[in-house]
């Protein structure tokens, strides 16, 4: 699994929110996420992800090579791996993959209900109304949803509106 969720990053927004997500997945409270704990993170974000993708992600974001993802590495995962947009083909492919993660019904648009569902899976407590507000910040065409072009633009602006 490559870059996955700039929408989550922009919705979480603050370091405190990212810490809460980290703590939710750090089941044993040791301040680091193991491979098994990472599997749960990935399952919440992408139920169809393969075990190989978990291993790849661990290698990519375990910056100090100790076999765990600590809070700093988790933040990097959100800032670089999950939220990073760009111009090369892999980045566009990664963005498309991230977009599809939220587009649960596959209609090419992320609705407030879809965003709410993903946020809920991540343990975030936000209402559908909160998600509508988040979407309205990047909804250029005013249809109440985020299409892929709006998603790309949001990500090229650093994950926020």
Swiss-Prot record:
Induction: By rain-, wind-, and touch (thigmomorphogenesis), dark, heat and cold treatments, hydrogen peroxide, ABA and auxin. GO terms for biological process: innate immune response; long-day photoperiodism, flowering; regulation of flower development; regulation of nitric oxide metabolic process; response to abscisic acid; response to absence of light; response to auxin; response to calcium ion. GO terms for molecular function: calcium ion binding. Ca(2+) 1 binds at residues 26, 28, 30, 32, 37. Keywords: Calcium, Metal-binding, Repeat. Ca(2+) 2 binds at residues 62, 64, 66, 73. Ca(2+) 3 binds at residues 103, 105, 107, 109, 114. Ca(2+) 4 binds at residues 139, 141, 143, 145, 150. Gene3D superfamilies: EF-hand (1.10.238.10). Expressed in seed coat, seedling radical, cotyledons, hypocotyl, shoot apex and elongating root. Expressed in the vasculature of cotyledons, leaves and roots. Highly expressed in guard cells, trichomes and hydathodes. Expressed in inflorescence stem branch points, silique abscission zone, young and mature styles and stigmatic papillae, mature anthers and developing seed. Pfam families: EF-hand_7 (PF13499). The keyword Transit peptide does not apply. InterPro entries: EF-hand-dom_pair, EF_Hand_1_Ca_BS, EF_hand_dom, EF_hand_pair_protein_CML-like. It comes from the Eukaryota. Residues 13-48, 49-84, 90-125, 126-161 form the EF-hand domain. Calcium-binding protein that may positively regulate abscisic acid (ABA) inhibition of germination and seedling development. May be required for photoperiod-induced flowering and function in ion homeostasis. This is Calcium-binding protein CML24. It comes from Arabidopsis thaliana (Mouse-ear cress).
């Amino acid at each position: 699994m490559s870059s996955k969720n700039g929408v989550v990053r922009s919705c979480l927004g603050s370091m405190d929110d990212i810490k809460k997500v980290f703590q939710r997945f750090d089941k044993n409270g040791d301040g680091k996420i193991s491979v098994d704990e990472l599997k749960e993170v990935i399952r919440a974000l992408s139920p169809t992800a393969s075990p190989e993708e978990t291993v790849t992600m661990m290698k990519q974001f375990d910056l100090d090579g100790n076999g765990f993802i600590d809070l700093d590495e988790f933040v990097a995962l959100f800032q670089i791996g999950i939220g990073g947009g760009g111009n090369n083909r892999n980045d566009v492919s990664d963005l498309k993959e991230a977009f599809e993660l939220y587009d649960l019904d596959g209609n090419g648009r992320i609705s407030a209900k879809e965003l709410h569902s993903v946020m809920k899976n991540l343990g975030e407590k936000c209402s559908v109304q909160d998600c509508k507000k988040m979407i309205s910040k990047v909804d250029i065409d005013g249809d109440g949803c985020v299409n892929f072009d709006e998603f790309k633009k949001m990500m090229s602006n650093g994950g926020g509106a």
